[in-house]
Amino acid sequence: MLRISRALRGSRTVGLVRARSVLSSNSTSLRYFSRLPTCYQEKTNNSTTTIPWYLKVGDRERALKQSIFKAQEINYPSNSPDSLRHISQYLCDELGLSDIIIFDLRKGEFETAAAKISDFMVIATARSPKHCQTSFDKLNSLIKQEYESVAYVEGQFNAREEKKRQRRLARKPKLSSNSTSNVPTESWFLIDCKVDKIFVNILTENRRQEINLEELYAPEHERHKYERKESSVEGREAPQEDDILAGLRRLVNQRRQYSTVAPSVVLCRQLLANLESSDFNGAISLINNNREYSLNFMKTIHDWVSGLEIDAAKEIPWKKWVTTFESCWPLVLPEESASLYWSLRMNFFKMINIADKEHYNINQFFNDYLLAKKSLGYPITSQDLIEFFKLTIINVRGDGEKSRGYWEIVNRNALVSRALRLVEDVKDGNSIVQDGTLVSMLLRTMVSGEEEVPNHMLHATYEVIDYLVDTFGAAMDPTAIGGVLEVLAAARSWNKYMAFWEAGVGGLVPGEDHRPWSQFIKLVVDSGDSEMIRKLLSEGHLLWLKRFEVKMTDDIKEQLDRLFEKGYSQGLWFEELKEHIYV
């Protein structure tokens, strides 16, 4: 015991000696530290502490996590359904989600697709990606049990997929070395509950801070509460900092800002502003610098032209607009959207022709659309021909007295012949002749002027009609029959009109007469030709309605009533015929 006590007294003596030596040596260090710049000293007595930015990174990250979403009671919108309250309380009480906010989207204009199809947008914070996944699984189970529905989720990345990803990276060392798989995945689950148009967003805290969905869905008068504000103190650089450290500071401070407006929308607005201010050079320059948005630019120009009034359209410099539109056309059309490009092109040039025929005629449309499409290796379809024939008819009937000469319509029809030659299988004639709408429109291009007065008709029209009768007879398409009747009625060729109508009668059987009877009677009544009306009533043509057991539709009855009224006004009485047909 004496030896132990002596040893302890000796160790205490040695400890005191060593402590004195350490204090004496540290006095030099303290004197040296006092000579350092003041930015590295901690001041007291009503002074602040100045610390370099690279020592405050951890504090900054902790500050970012202090959001405005404090623990609070859930505020429900007025007149909200019970399902919303049930789901929200389940998220809070059972799943442990925090900072739950509900936005009422029933009123207001929102640009996002989710906002347009939802009434309530719920946003909640989870503690981890695993918490997000578990919360979705349990919420989906609740929806199945309580509401007999299945939720739809976007952004799901479960543990099984994470394990597959890890195994794939393990097999490829290069990918694994460059991967940030050791960093926890930041999750965002967007869930359509399929109940009362309720959508739920479950996000991790950092992800919620980064995306800031609240600013997107908040009402206009509350949006300022959720705007992201960057600290101005942290963004201030000290003049004595090294350039490398300043670059690192900017790298740490940067945060990606998400925009809810697509770049194409901004560029299209700028394009429209240039065109409305007649800055065509600026518009073409904008298009050339953003070739990837060519389809969006074409839609913008097309929609603007379609919204013009007829009176204002005549004052538009169409040549410059056409040049701007052509500059949108890509050198190589993408196959997946080629049909959209051609559809926009056809409609755009059609609108220009209708708006200003003097400066953009039908020949220019033929070159800019049909010939251009054929030269680029795309086939001319039946719909292309139908639209071209319609436009030709509009141009012919809109030119007044100029279009009523026989040789004028011959010249017009030469362009129609050129269009037909562009069809690859035109030699067979099957694709054209068997299309009733196409035949009808083709025949209408062979008649000039308005339908209310006698018009010129090409001699070749009769040859085409005879060919149709010989080829198809009673099996001719009803639409084609209607087209032939309109052409013959417009030319007042009534003998040919009646001969064509009865040409295929021999091949008909009761119950199989599908000819357009209402159109046949209507054209005669609209013509006002008293001789033709008397002939139709007195020569027994209407008796075929009973012989072939034609179904008496409302349209046929309406036209028959008009026909008999015309006969009464001319002193013709056919009460027995009327009763026989209507019975």
UniProtKB/Swiss-Prot annotation:
It holds the Pfam family RsfS. GO terms for biological process: mitochondrial gene expression; mRNA stabilization. It comes from the Eukaryota. It is a peripheral membrane protein. Keywords: Membrane, Mitochondrion, Mitochondrion inner membrane, Transit peptide. Residues 163-183 are annotated as: Disordered. The keyword Mitochondrion applies. Its main location: mitochondrion. Probable mitochondrial mRNA stabilization factor. Belongs to the ATP25 family. It is found in: Mitochondrion inner membrane. This is ATPase synthesis protein 25, mitochondrial. The gene is ATP25. Residues 1-29 form a transit peptide. InterPro entries: Atp25 (IPR040152), ATP25_mRNA_stabil_dom (IPR025210), NT_sf (IPR043519). The lineage of its organism: Eukaryota, Fungi, Dikarya, Ascomycota, Saccharomycotina. Residues 165-174 have a biased composition (Basic residues). It comes from Zygosaccharomyces rouxii (strain ATCC 2623 / CBS 732 / NBRC 1130 / NCYC 568 / NRRL Y-229). GO terms for cellular component: mitochondrial inner membrane.
